[in-house]
């Protein structure tokens, strides 16, 4: 097995005159297919880090059952998945071919996404294949970047990090020159035509009634059913990202440019985070609208906390998260329970479940065993996913999957891909859903989808004014 060894070369610069957004605007044309990850965590800025990844040098992808790996020496390998060579085996084989040492080796890893469609490789789920030529993005895609720009909000500094191979010249000065350039260009964004959906309101309500019937029959306790919206546009979708991050600051803000398509959003929910052998899941279950008025929001929060349907649903999904982690962890417990968290258009109830990885546990397998989130599928998870594939008119693509970082050291941080746009060929896809139980009301569930999409729709309007 060939290996690629790197040492992290770095430069620390004052960060008080540079924001992640302005820096990204400076470097994106010089370094195509770059990415931006930000955090806007209301718990405090001491742990906030933002990242820009530049110059893809290696990638791991899975599509239609074929694993494709591309390496820094431009070599390329393709291999089909088999019962003896599954996704976690392929991923670990890929990651083992990289060695990173140095001061910032902990940031050595791959950045990318796992679509909801990838469940076909983990469970017996008949995911609908897409016949849409515009929907040819890999089901799983993670990329290793040559350069990282790391922003430390608390210390007001940024660090330029380069993966430097043996006997390889450094080009970190070129990145520094681009960052220190005071000039950058922004471009307009304009929505064209009306927002459409692949389901009418009545068709989605019909699907909700199907979900309620399955719950009443005992097929599932809960099922998450979603609908997709489509908006044509002209101009620069990064301007839309800027609007979204302004309207809906979240723990996970991201803009991934993959060349032919982009994925960007503002997710509130941690799917799975592993750091120093500790794994956490932050299930969100229970949502109500946010009015913007302090007294009204307090009353809405109290009503949400007292709602027996929402309480039962939340408890069930916390138990599901605990069971998922227990497959590879011990000392699994709930750190906090039903904490109200406030976002631009909604109020969520959030819990945190954590556990310590077993001695022989593999982080990639631990992540896969929690995928997808119960909050985006239902319970029991496998049966819910089978029904989702049957009821929803198309596969979900990125929606409901994960996006984030997987480290060479075993750490990972994955957000659930919600409150997210997929952009391709001047067309935006965005999607939202809600958890259906036996006592659900179809009109309330329809409104919950609209509440969750409120930030995205408002961002489209704001982006046209930037």
Stretches with model-predicted labels:
Residues 1-466:
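Extended alpha-helical targeting/anchoring segments
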């Amino acid at each position: 097995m060939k290996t690629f060894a790197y040492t992290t070369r770095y430069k620390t610069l004052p960060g008080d005159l540079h924001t992640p957004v302005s820096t990204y605007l400076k470097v994106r044309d010089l370094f195509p297919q770059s990415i931006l990850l930000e955090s806007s965590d209301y718990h405090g800025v001491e742990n906030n880090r933002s990242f820009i990844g530049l110059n893809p040098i290696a990638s791991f992808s899975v599509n239609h059952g074929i694993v494709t790996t591309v390496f820094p020496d431009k070599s390329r390998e393709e291999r089909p998945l088999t019962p003896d060579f599954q996704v976690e085996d392929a991923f670990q084989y890929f990651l083992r071919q990289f060695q990173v040492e140095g001061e910032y080796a902990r940031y050595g890893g791959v950045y990318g996404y796992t679509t909801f469609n990838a469940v076909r490789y983990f469970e017996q789920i008949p995911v609908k294949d897409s016949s849409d030529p515009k929907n040819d993005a890999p089901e799983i895609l993670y990329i290793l970047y040559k350069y990282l720009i790391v922003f430390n909000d608390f210390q007001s500094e940024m660090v330029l990090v380069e993966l430097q191979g043996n006997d390889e010249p450094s080009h970190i000065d070129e990145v520094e020159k681009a960052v220190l350039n005071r000039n950058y260009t922004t471009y307009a964004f304009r929505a064209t035509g009306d927002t459409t959906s692949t389901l009418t309101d009545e068709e989605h309500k019909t699907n909700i009634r199907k979900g309620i019937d399955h719950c009443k029959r005992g097929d599932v306790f809960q099922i998450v059913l979603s609908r997709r919206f489509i908006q044509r546009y002209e101009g620069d979708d990064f301007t839309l990202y800027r609007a979204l991050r302004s309207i809906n600051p979240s723990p996970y803000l991201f803009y991934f440019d993959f060349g032919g398509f982009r994925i960007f959003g503002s997710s509130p929910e941690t799917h799975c985070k592993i750091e120093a052998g500790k794994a956490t899941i932050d299930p969100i279950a229970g949502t109500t609208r946010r009015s913007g008025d302090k007294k009204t929001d307090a009353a809405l929060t109290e009503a949400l906390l007292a709602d027996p349907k929402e309480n039962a649903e939340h408890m069930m999904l916390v138990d599901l998260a605990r069971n998922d982690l227990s497959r590879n962890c011990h000392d699994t417990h709930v750190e906090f329970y039903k904490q109200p968290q406030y976002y631009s258009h909604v109020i969520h109830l959030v819990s945190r479940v954590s556990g310590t990885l077993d001695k022989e546990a593999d982080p990639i397998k631990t992540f896969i065993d929690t995928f997808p989130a119960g909050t985006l599928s239902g319970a029991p998870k496998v049966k819910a996913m089978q029904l989702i594939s049957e009821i929803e008119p198309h596969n979900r693509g990125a929606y409901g999957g994960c996006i984030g970082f997987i480290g060479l050291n075993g750490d990972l941080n994955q957000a659930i891909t919600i409150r997210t746009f997929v952009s391709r060929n001047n067309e935006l896809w965005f999607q939202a859903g809600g958890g259906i139980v036996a006592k659900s009301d179809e009109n309330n569930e329809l409104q919950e989808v609209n509440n969750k999409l409120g930030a995205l729709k408002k961002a489209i309007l704001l982006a046209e004014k930037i």
